[in-house]
Amino acid sequence: MAFWIASSPHNHNHTKTPNLMRLVIYATLPGVLAQWYFFGWGNLIHIGLAMTTAIICEFTVLSLRKKPISHELFDGSALLTALLLGICLPALAPWWITVIGTMFAIVIVKQLYGGLGHNPFNPAMAGYVMLLVSFPLQMTLWQPPLTLVAVDLNFTNTLTTILTGFTVEGYSVEQVRTSIDGITMATPLDTLKTNTGLGLTVLESIKNPIFGENLALGWEWVNAGFLLGGLFLISRKAIAWQTPISFLLSLFICSFIGYSISPDSSASTMFHWFSGATMLGAFFILTDPVTGATSNKGRIIVGLLAGLLVYLIRTSGGYPDGVAFAILLCNMSAPLIDQYTRPRTYGHLKGDK
C-alpha cells in the first residue's frame, strides 16, 4: 500500500494576520477603559487621531509603492501601531504630536523598511521615542488622575485642549495639570525619581496624592487592565509566554534587590510592576513577532534583558520610565540573540552550517 506523505511542515497554523491583529486590539480594551475612567477622554482622542493618520499614511505609501492596497491596508497592523502609540502619549498632548509620531511610525519605521514583517524596530515605540527626544516639553506634560484635577475635563474640554492648548474656559495645559491643592502634578515614576534625587526617601515621596492609597493612583488599574488583556492573549496562544514572564521576573528580581539594599531610595517590586508602561510593554510590545526573538531561549533572554534595562533606566537614567528605550535596544539585539539561540535543525549535528 502506498502512502502519500505531504511535505513539511505537517503542523499548520491557520491564524491570519488580520485575525491576530484584531485579537490584540480587543485585548487592550481593559487597559484602555481603565485609562479612560481614571484619566478622561484624552488618550481615546489621540487613539482616534492616530488611527486616522495611520490609515491615510498607509494608503499613500502603498499607492506610491504600487502594493495591493485592499490586502495590506486592512491587515490591522497600522491600526494596532496607532492604538499603541495613542495609549502611550500624554492625554493632553497637542494634536500635531500624534500626527507626527504616527507618520514617523508608519512611513519611516514600517514602510521604509519594506512594510509588515520587515521593520527592525517596533513602529509604535520608535515613534514614541522620536517624539520624546524631539519634543520633550510636550511629551512630559502628563495629566494627573481626574480626581486630582481642579478643571472639569469633559469630552469638549479635553478635545479643545488637545486642538488649541486651552480649555473652553481658557485654562492652559499647565493650569489643568495643577491639582486641587495648587500643586503641579507628574506621574508617580517621575515624582519618585525627582524626589529621591532631591534626597527625600521613598516613604516621604509616596505621601504625594499622586500615589493614592495603593501604588500609583490610577496607573495600577491601567496596568492591571493590560495584564488581564495579556493573560487573555497567552490563553489564546496569540503571544508566546516566555518574553513577558521573563521580563516581569527580571524587573521583579532587580527591584527586589534594589529595595532590599536601600528601601529608602528604591521603590518596591509591585510599584515597578504596576506603574508606567510595564504591563503594556510586557504583553503588547515586547511580544511583537517581527521585532522580537524567534527562539524560546531567545525570547527568555530578550525578556530578561528588557527587565534589566527598564530598571536601570528608571533608577539611573535620565527618563522616569525606560520601557520604550529598553524595547528598542532589545529590538537591536534580537537578531544577534537569535543567532546564538537558534535550535538545532532536525537531522543536522550541532555546529553544522
UniProtKB/Swiss-Prot annotation:
Pfam families: NQR2_RnfD_RnfE (PF03116). The modification FMN phosphoryl threonine is found at T187. It is an enzyme of class 7 (translocase). Coiled coil: none annotated. The keyword Translocase applies. One of its GO terms (cellular component) is plasma membrane. Its cofactor is FMN. Keywords: Cell inner membrane, Cell membrane, Electron transport, Flavoprotein, FMN, Membrane, Phosphoprotein, Translocase, Transmembrane, Transmembrane helix, Transport. It is found in: Cell inner membrane. InterPro entries: NqrB/RnfD (IPR004338), RnfD_bac (IPR011303). It is a multi-pass membrane protein. HAMAP family: RsxD_RnfD. The complex is composed of six subunits: RnfA, RnfB, RnfC, RnfD, RnfE and RnfG. PANTHER family: ELECTRON TRANSPORT COMPLEX PROTEIN RNFD, ION-TRANSLOCATING OXIDOREDUCTASE COMPLEX SUBUNIT D. NCBIfam families: PRK00816.1, rnfD. Belongs to the NqrB/RnfD family. This is Ion-translocating oxidoreductase complex subunit D.
